[in-house]
């Protein structure tokens, strides 16, 4: 006797064989004239299977290990997960940029004239490079023990971030196209706007970091001690997530500069 499950299976088999000639055995790939032909959707799917899944598994195992053997593991592992997820989000946008810029049709930047000044972009890049150097110094001082000058370094990094936000806003005000002007304008505003929001979050983290350091010095809490007449503060390991997040923002900007501003 035919049951409902058997009837459903027979119907599916009937539709499969009736449309056998119309079934495609491959995914739609890029045109052969583009440089993305070697990484078409078929091979990209295989790449996801052998790259993303093992990475997610390694992160999962690492989080379990850190939850048992590390004191501040939950916050650090959570921050690493956030950074990795944001990196994957930016990768999807960069993939879209490559897709439309290397495809022969439609034109990627039809009717778009980039009006950003080269000096403005170089200034923005120089500011973030300076912030990266200061962040490296901050990381070194955290590992060795923080002196009284560390609060000034954090404040300088915060000021550099404010300068970046001001220059980015100036660029937006002088652009000659909008977000709905072709796919180029859409991707430009989406990617740079998303990065701008990450910079704002990084500035908030730096501001909180600076306030915590000042309060620790003012209250002379148990975090501070003196050695050979020099005052130090030992901060918990969780404060390094701010530095890690700021480095991530700087690296993303280098990719943005390459995709949008390089010739």
From Swiss-Prot:
The keyword Transcription does not apply. Its EC number is 7.1.1.9. It is found in: Mitochondrion inner membrane. Keywords: Membrane, Mitochondrion, Mitochondrion inner membrane, Translocase, Transmembrane, Transmembrane helix. The keyword Transmembrane applies. GO terms for biological process: mitochondrial electron transport, cytochrome c to oxygen. InterPro entries: Cyt_c/ubiquinol_Oxase_su3, Cyt_c_oxidase-like_su3, Cyt_c_oxidase_su3-like_sf, Cyt_c_oxidase_su3_a-hlx. It catalyses: 4 Fe(II)-[cytochrome c] + O2 + 8 H(+)(in) = 4 Fe(III)-[cytochrome c] + 2 H2O + 4 H(+)(out). Signal peptide: none annotated. It is an enzyme of class 7 (translocase). It is a multi-pass membrane protein. It comes from the Eukaryota. This is Cytochrome c oxidase subunit 3. It comes from Plasmodium vivax. The lineage of its organism: Eukaryota, Sar, Alveolata, Apicomplexa, Aconoidasida.
């Amino acid at each position: 006797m035919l049951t409902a499950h058997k009837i459903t299976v027979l119907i599916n088999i009937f539709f499969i064989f009736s449309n056998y000639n119309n079934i495609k055995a491959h995914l739609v790939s890029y045109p052969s004239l583009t440089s993305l032909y070697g990484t078409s959707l078929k091979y990209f799917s295989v790449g996801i299977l052998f790259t993303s899944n093992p990475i997610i598994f390694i992160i999962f195992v690492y989080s379990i290990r850190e939850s048992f053997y590390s004191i501040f593991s939950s916050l650090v592992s959570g921050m690493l997960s956030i950074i990795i997820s944001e990196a994957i989000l930016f990768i999807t946008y960069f993939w879209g940029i490559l897709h439309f810029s290397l495809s022969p049709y439609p034109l990627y930047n039809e009717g778009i004239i980039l009006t950003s000044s080269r000096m403005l972009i170089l200034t923005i890049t120089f500011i973030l490079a300076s912030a990266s150097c200061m962040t490296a110094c901050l990381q070194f001082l955290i590992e060795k023990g923080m002196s009284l000058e560390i609060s000034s370094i954090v404040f300088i990094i915060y000021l550099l971030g404010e300068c970046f936000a001001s220059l980015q806003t100036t660029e937006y005000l002088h652009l000659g196209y909008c977000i709905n002007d072709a796919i180029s304008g859409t991707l430009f505003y989406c990617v740079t706007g998303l990065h701008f929001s990450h910079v704002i979050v990084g500035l908030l983290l730096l501001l909180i970091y600076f306030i915590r350091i000042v309060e620790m010095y003012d209250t002379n809490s148990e975090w501070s001690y003196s050695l050979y007449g020099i005052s130090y503060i030992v901060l918990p390991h969780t404060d390094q997530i701010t530095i890690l997040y700021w480095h991530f923002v700087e690296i993303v900007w280098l990719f943005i500069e390459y995709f949008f501003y390089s010739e």
